[in-house]
């Protein structure tokens, strides 16, 4: 498994255990840097310590604060908003350049729906795909 794949697997496991995700923001809001192909992603982490390492070691994110987001809010409002804005979801970015695995909001919802045996997950997927 690649390092990005390992971060992806850890993300789902840890978010499920923690019940929340972690983002970073500064006075300008949440970052959404573009990759080499121009696609933008908002990064999220499964543990505050992962996000804190990026803030501490990646110059571009110096001064950002780590913000917890309850998983229900993240899978609901956040995924709808990211889909609307055509943004990807960065998963446990790490390293000197804060890079990693990116998913579409729909992929994230399907990924977490596998763990959630309720109709609520299906409804969120359908609302994002509309």
Describe the function of each predicted region:
Residues 1-130:
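Conserved NAD+-utilizing ADP-ribose enzyme module
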